[in-house]
Amino acid sequence: MRVLGIDPGLANLGLGLVEGDVRRAKHLYHVCLTTESAWLMPRRLQYLHEELTRLLTEYRPDAVAIEDQILRRQADVAFKVGQAFGVVQLACAQAGVPIHAYGPMQVKKSLVGTGRADKEQVIYMVKASLGIRELFNNHAADALALALTHLAHAPMQERSERLAAAGRAARTGDAPLRR
């Protein structure tokens, strides 16, 4: 499975691509897309959309793992991050790539074993899991952490989705015939 992790932000949008499964994850790519604060908002959003669309087309991930947006204390920051989040959703929908959201505590627990882990512990586990010596950007590190989290959770999510679909089909009378 190929997963693109995304740490959404308007000034800095982290991207990290991994492939494999939870036991054998391989690092393929990471980058932090940066927009200039002097750019007008439409230009910033257009740049993020164009770059993300290009990367989705080039790398063709099976899924996107994005940081679930938590309530932020500063309304202006929340608004800007929300706009970047919307651009990510649009680009993924256009590319036909499913999005899975994970909260910060869920990512920390998945990688370190505790939801109270600090940033350095998460970065250490990302580097150790992927065999990376240097990660120069926290946003890209967060994106890789999100991708690894999805690799760990994907098998369980797929099973849950199949069971839910079977339950819906049974309730509506559309259950497949058993032979």
Curated annotation (Swiss-Prot):
<keyword id="KW-0963">Cytoplasm</keyword>
<feature type="active site">
    <location>
        <position position="67"/>
    </location>
</feature>
<feature type="active site">
    <location>
        <position position="7"/>
    </location>
</feature>
<keyword id="KW-0460">Magnesium</keyword>
<keyword id="KW-0238">DNA-binding</keyword>
<feature type="binding site">
    <location>
        <position position="67"/>
    </location>
    <ligand>
        <name>Mn(2+) 2</name>
    </ligand>
</feature>
<dbReference type="GO" id="GO:0048476">
    <property type="term" value="C:Holliday junction resolvase complex"/>
</dbReference>
<feature type="active site">
    <location>
        <position position="142"/>
    </location>
</feature>
<dbReference type="InterPro" id="IPR012337">
    <property type="entry name" value="RNaseH-like_sf"/>
</dbReference>
<dbReference type="GO" id="GO:0008821">
    <property type="term" value="F:crossover junction DNA endonuclease activity"/>
</dbReference>
<keyword id="KW-0540">Nuclease</keyword>
<comment type="similarity">
    <text>Belongs to the RuvC family.</text>
</comment>
<comment type="function">
    <text>Binds HJ DNA independently of homologous core or consensus sequence; Mn(2+) is not essential for binding but improves it, while &gt;1.0 mM Mg(2+) inhibit binding. Also binds Y-junction DNA less well. Requires a homologous core to cleave DNA. Another study shows divalent cations (Mn(2+), Mg(2+) and Ca(2+), tested up to 5.0 mM) improve DNA binding considerably over binding in their absence.</text>
</comment>
<comment type="subunit">
    <text>Homodimer which binds Holliday junction (HJ) DNA. The HJ becomes 2-fold symmetrical on binding to RuvC with unstacked arms; it has a different conformation from HJ DNA in complex with RuvA. In the full resolvosome a probable DNA-RuvA(4)-RuvB(12)-RuvC(2) complex forms which resolves the HJ.</text>
</comment>
<dbReference type="GO" id="GO:0003677">
    <property type="term" value="F:DNA binding"/>
</dbReference>
<feature type="short sequence motif" description="DNA-binding loop">
    <location>
        <begin position="68"/>
        <end position="74"/>
    </location>
</feature>
<feature type="active site">
    <location>
        <position position="139"/>
    </location>
</feature>
<keyword id="KW-0227">DNA damage</keyword>
<dbReference type="GO" id="GO:0000287">
    <property type="term" value="F:magnesium ion binding"/>
</dbReference>
<keyword id="KW-0234">DNA repair</keyword>
<keyword id="KW-0255">Endonuclease</keyword>
<protein>
    <recommendedName>
        <fullName>Crossover junction endodeoxyribonuclease RuvC</fullName>
        <ecNumber>3.1.21.10</ecNumber>
    </recommendedName>
</protein>
<feature type="binding site">
    <location>
        <position position="7"/>
    </location>
    <ligand>
        <name>Mn(2+) 1</name>
    </ligand>
</feature>
<dbReference type="InterPro" id="IPR002176">
    <property type="entry name" value="X-over_junc_endoDNase_RuvC"/>
</dbReference>
<keyword id="KW-0479">Metal-binding</keyword>
<dbReference type="Pfam" id="PF02075">
    <property type="entry name" value="RuvC"/>
</dbReference>
<dbReference type="GO" id="GO:0006310">
    <property type="term" value="P:DNA recombination"/>
</dbReference>
<keyword id="KW-0233">DNA recombination</keyword>
<comment type="function">
    <text>The RuvA-RuvB-RuvC complex processes Holliday junction (HJ) DNA during genetic recombination and DNA repair. Endonuclease that resolves HJ intermediates. Cleaves cruciform DNA by making single-stranded nicks across the HJ at symmetrical positions within the homologous arms, probably yielding a 5'-phosphate and a 3'-hydroxyl group; requires a central core of homology in the junction. The consensus cleavage sequence is 5'-(G/C)TC(C/G)-3' (a different site than E.coli); cleavage occurs on the 3'-side of the TC dinucleotide at the point of strand exchange.</text>
</comment>
<feature type="binding site">
    <location>
        <position position="139"/>
    </location>
    <ligand>
        <name>Mn(2+) 1</name>
    </ligand>
</feature>
<dbReference type="InterPro" id="IPR036397">
    <property type="entry name" value="RNaseH_sf"/>
</dbReference>
<dbReference type="GO" id="GO:0006281">
    <property type="term" value="P:DNA repair"/>
</dbReference>
<dbReference type="GO" id="GO:0005737">
    <property type="term" value="C:cytoplasm"/>
</dbReference>
<keyword id="KW-0378">Hydrolase</keyword>
